[in-house]
C-alpha cells in the first residue's frame, strides 16, 4: 500500500501545491477584509443574506462562517477532482500496469482516495491558517487564528463524505465515479442555497454541509461532525 500511496502522491503533488498556494492567498483575502465587511454590505438586504448564510451572530462572524462554508465546498470539489484521477489512470491503461505487479485493486483505489483526503486537509489548513493569521493581525487577538482554523477544519467531515461517494460510485464502474460531481452540486444547492430558498429543514439536512458547525461565532459541537 505504501508504494501505491507514493505513486498517487507523485501524480497529485503538483496540482495540490498549486491549490494550496491559491487557498493560502484566498485565506489572506478573506481574513484581511473581514474588518471592512460592514462597509461592503451597507444595505439591510445584503446584511440579511450573510446572516442567513452564517447563522444568527455578528456580521463579521457571519461573513467569515459563510466564506469558510463556501470554501469548504470548493475543497470538496478538489477532493472529487483528485479522487477522479482513478478514472484517468484507468482510462489511460496505466492502472493495468500497476495492477499487473500484484497490487490489489483495493490497495490501488485506497491509495488515491487517501491522497485525495489528505489533500483536502492541506487545503483546509492553508485557508484556516492564512485567514486566521490575517484576522489576528487586524484584531490583535491570537484566538482569532484558532477560531478560523477550527472553522476551516470542521468542513472536512462533509468533504470526506463527498470523496466517499466518489469511491463508492467507482466501485460500480469508473464512469459511475462522475456521480461525485452530481452529489457535490446537489449538496451545494441544499446546504448553501436551501436556507435562502426557505426549503423544508429535512431537505436541507440531506446535505452534509448543512451539519457543519458555523464557526467562528458558535460553540463547537462534535455530534454533527460524526
Question: Where do the language-model regions lie?
Answer:
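A structural motif at transmembrane helix-loop-helix junctions in multipass membrane proteins
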Residues: 156-189
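Transmembrane helix boundary and interhelical loop/hinge segments in multi-pass membrane proteins
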Residues: 80-99
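Secretory targeting signals
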Residues: 114-167
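Terminal transmembrane helical anchor/hairpin motif
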Residues: 1, 13, 17, 21, ...
